[in-house]
Curated annotation (Swiss-Prot):
An annotated Gene Ontology molecular function: DNA binding
Protein name: Homeodomain-only protein
Described function: Atypical homeodomain protein which does not bind DNA and is required to modulate cardiac growth and development. May act via an interaction with SRF, leading to modulate the expression of SRF-dependent cardiac-specific genes and cardiac development. May act as a co-chaperone for HSPA1A and HSPA1B chaperone proteins and assist in chaperone-mediated protein refolding.
Subcellular location: Nucleus; Cytoplasm
One CC-aspect GO term: nucleus
Provenance organism: Gallus gallus (Chicken)
A GO BP annotation: negative regulation of cell differentiation
Highest classification ranks of the organism: Eukaryota, Metazoa, Chordata, Craniata, Vertebrata
SMART domains hit by this protein: HOX (SM00389)
Keyword Transcription regulation (UniProt): yes
Gene name for this UniProt entry: HOPX
PROSITE patterns assigned: HOMEOBOX_2
Residue ranges of DNA binding: 3-62
Amino acid sequence: MATEKSVTPTEEQLEILEYNFCKVNKHPDPTTLCLIAAETGLSEEQTLKWFKQRLAEWRKSEGLPSECGSVRD
């Protein structure tokens, strides 16, 4: 498995990612993730990694365990 270099999203990419995280869905399904990746120009893997890290950050800020399952599960 090839590992991708860590890529820091640009300000424009971050705006798209944050908008989708805050206003659309904190748990994007594979199709939505693919669309977000296409919109940002990031790979699906990079986009998924960003969402996972951002979700852990959000959970921490809310006083929730960073690794807990979704209430939707």
